């Protein structure tokens, strides 16, 4: 599949920086995937059904997208699709067989650890698949089959639209494995509409106000449960990458196993509270944090008395990770601006990690 890139979109087009531009492009990327990626998604779903052992790999943001996928395959298709960080996979790939399927996620398609892991999988005869934004990249050329992210160039070092594109592909693929691709496509379209509404000035002003509350924080914690747990990890990564605030994501159920010792008076705590089976437990966790002085920033469709601040998201069911990403992206972005950071070029980071 050839991707036609509109070169007029390579510039800033009136945006102050690439991060804000690429965050704003997320709805149209999701709509493009629904319109064009169906055949590749069906092929990947068929390969997953035919495999005996399927494994997903990614590094950084791509790893959290892949981890989200492991939850989606379980919830939607009742299928166990394993996840591993790309940099660790080579240390326990000994169980791979020619019946295995290894799916790598990468924006650039050039990540050194991913390429090394895929070469190891190929040496064991396993089938290779790639979900990639650069079809002519090393990963794009080495795999047996590919799903193109169709996100267009991503210039900011931080990945925003490629992340939501990966999660959208996974949501649709999980439905395709189950034989319900159209249901997955409809969920992605609902999420795209929700994101477009969230990009309105009234909502972004709310995020900017919350960013002003956290800009001087030394530490920040993000919690989620179930499908929102990988989102919490990605949210913490985005915030720390761009704002340089020490942010950590945790499974909410792990709070009492050590994490809560770090919470002090005024510690910002971002709490993902979707309308799903995790809601009651996540609110209980928020209360535990607040009782120890935590400043609770709730993200979800409904407010709650425990929240000190609330960033509303649309209720889109299993597409929740697609709308949950934007609040953290934008929170990190505005905190970075308030702290005088360049959001497009965070210190010590490169767009493509081509060395180990």
Describe every region a protein language model picked out.
Residues 5, 11-55, 145-268, 309, ...:
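Active-site phosphate/pyrophosphate-binding segments
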Residues 46-196, 225, 272-318, 331, ...:
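Glycine-rich phosphate-binding loops that contact phosphosugars or nucleotide phosphates
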């Amino acid at each position: 599949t050839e991707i036609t890139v509109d070169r007029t979109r390579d510039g800033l087009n009136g945006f102050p920086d690439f991060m804000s531009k690429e965050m704003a492009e997320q709805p149209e990327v999701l709509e493009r995937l629904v319109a064009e990626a169906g055949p590749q998604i069906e092929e990947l779903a068929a390969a997953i059904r035919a495999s005996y052992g399927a494994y997903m790999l990614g590094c950084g943001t791509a790893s959290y997208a892949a981890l989200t996928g492991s939850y989606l395959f379980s919830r939607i298709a009742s299928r166990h699709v394993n996840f591993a960080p790309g940099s660790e996979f080579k240390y326990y790939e000994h169980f791979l067989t020619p019946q295995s399927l290894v799916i790598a996620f990468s924006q650039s398609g050039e990540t050194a650890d991913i390429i090394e892991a895929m070469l190891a999988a190929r040496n064991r005869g396993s089938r290779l698949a790639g979900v990639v934004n650069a079809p002519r990249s090393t990963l794009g050329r080495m795999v047996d089959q590919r799903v193109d992210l169709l996100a267009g160039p991503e210039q900011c070092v931080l990945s925003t639209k490629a992340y939501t594109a990966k999660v959208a592909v996974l949501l649709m693929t999980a439905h395709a494995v189950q034989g319900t691709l159209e249901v997955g496509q409809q969920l992605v379209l609902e999420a795209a509409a929700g994101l477009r509404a969230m990009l309105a000035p009234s909502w972004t002003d709310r995020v900017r106000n919350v960013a002003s509350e956290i800009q001087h924080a030394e530490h920040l914690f993000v919690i989620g449960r179930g499908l929102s747990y990988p989102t919490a990890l990605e949210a913490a990564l985005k915030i720390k990458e761009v704002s340089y605030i020490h942010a950590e994501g945790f499974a909410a159920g792990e709070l009492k196993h050590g994490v809560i010792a770090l919470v002090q008076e005024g510690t910002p705590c971002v709490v993902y509270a979707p309308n799903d089976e995790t809601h009651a437990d996540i609110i209980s966790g928020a209360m535990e944090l607040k009782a120890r002085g935590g400043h609770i920033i709730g993200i979800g469709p409904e407010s709650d008395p425990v929240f000190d601040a609330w960033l509303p998201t649309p209720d889109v069911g299993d597409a929740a990770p697609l709308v949950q990403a934007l609040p953290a992206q934008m929170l990190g972005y505005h905190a970075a601006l308030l702290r005088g950071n360049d959001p497009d070029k965070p210190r010590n980071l490169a767009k493509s990690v081509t060395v180990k």
